[in-house]
């Protein structure tokens, strides 16, 4: 009786132990079977599969990628299986698969693949192109006259500094002589508005002789194709006429200052050539009309 009890307990104890069972899915077993195929069988099988899928070239990459996944062996989650070392036969099978797939590719697909490689190299070369080479033509065009412009600006700055030195010393006669000597209309346009303001404020340090000496330069400004130059010249003429209008409009035959007679003659001759400025619309024409109204009274 005791023996039976002991036997029952032993049997129950053995039954209570739940030994883990090796679980292999259908997908894993199928893959393991495919791994056992010989290289020639595997190449023939893949060739048939690719021949069916090559009708739609877009699926070719998916087929190759799927076959690569199939060759993997998935280990069981419960047991540690010993992985077989990589053999040269498997690599040879891969090479045979690629050659077999390439042999079944249609002609247009092969041509497209070669074209894709060429386009890829072209796009790579365009992406690696440096900005300096891309805009080299633009930079060369911009910098074509850069040295000449730099020399002009340097010379202009130097001459303006000299004129500023004369102005600070209140040596107006030396300043006018310097402007007449260099004959640089750009410097004259920068300096003449300062003299115009002094004439409008009736400063005593600007003499009538200085204005007479500046008339040839003002004539060049009125004949310029730049409207800014013309406006500067007209403003100066207007300021000079208003500053010495009492002497210019005098009917006395005896003129105490000979420069008044010279100025009157030069103004009349100058305006005979530049009276067309009254036809210019806008601010320029308005100043020209005002100067013309003063000079008509002198005849």
From Swiss-Prot:
It comes from Mus musculus (Mouse). One of its GO terms (biological process) is positive regulation of cytoskeleton organization. The gene is Katnbl1. Regulates microtubule-severing activity of KATNAL1 in a concentration-dependent manner in vitro. It holds the Pfam family Katanin_con80. GO terms for cellular component: cleavage furrow; cytoplasm; katanin complex; midbody; mitotic spindle pole; nucleolus; nucleoplasm; nucleus. Keywords: Cytoplasm, Cytoskeleton, Nucleus, Phosphoprotein. The keyword Signal does not apply. Interacts with KATNA1 and KATNAL1; these interactions are competed by KATNB1 which has a higher affinity for them. The modification Phosphoserine is found at residue 56. GO terms for molecular function: microtubule binding. A motif (Nuclear localization signal) lies at residues 8-15. It is found in: Nucleus; Cytoplasm, Cytoskeleton, Spindle pole. This is KATNB1-like protein 1.
């Amino acid at each position: 009786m005791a023996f039976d009890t002991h036997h029952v307990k032993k049997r129950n104890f053995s039954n209570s132990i739940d030994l883990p069972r090796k679980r292999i899915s259908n997908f894993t077993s199928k893959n393991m079977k495919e791994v056992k195929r010989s290289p020639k069988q595997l190449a023939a099988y893949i060739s048939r599969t690719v021949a069916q899928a090559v009708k739609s070239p877009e699926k070719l990459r998916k087929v190759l990628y799927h076959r690569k996944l199939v060759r993997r062996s998935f280990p069981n989650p419960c047991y540690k299986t010993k992985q077989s070392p990589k053999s040269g036969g498997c690599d040879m099978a891969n090479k045979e698969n690629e050659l077999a797939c390439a042999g079944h590719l249609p002609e247009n697909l092969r041509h497209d693949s070669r074209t894709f490689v060429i386009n890829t190299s072209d796009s790579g070369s365009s992406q690696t192109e440096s900005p300096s080479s891309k805009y080299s033509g633009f930079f060369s065009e911009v910098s074509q006259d850069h040295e000449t412009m730099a020399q002009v600006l340097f010379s202009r700055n130097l001459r303006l500094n000299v004129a500023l030195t004369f102005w600070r010393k209140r040596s107006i006669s030396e300043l006018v002589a310097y402007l007449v000597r260099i004959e640089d209309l750009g410097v004259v346009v920068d300096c003449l508005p300062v003299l115009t303001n002094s004439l409008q404020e009736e400063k005593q340090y600007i003499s009538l002789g200085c204005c007479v000496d500046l008339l040839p330069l003002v004539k060049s400004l009125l004949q310029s194709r730049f409207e800014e130059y013309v406006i500067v010249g007209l403003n100066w003429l207007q300021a000079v006429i208003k500053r010495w209008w009492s002497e210019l409009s005098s009917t006395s035959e005896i003129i105490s200052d000979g420069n008044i007679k010279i100025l009157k003659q030069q103004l009349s001759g100058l305006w005979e050539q530049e009276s067309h400025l009254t036809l210019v619309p806008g601010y320029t024409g308005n100043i020209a009309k005002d100067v013309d109204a003063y000079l008509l009274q002198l005849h």
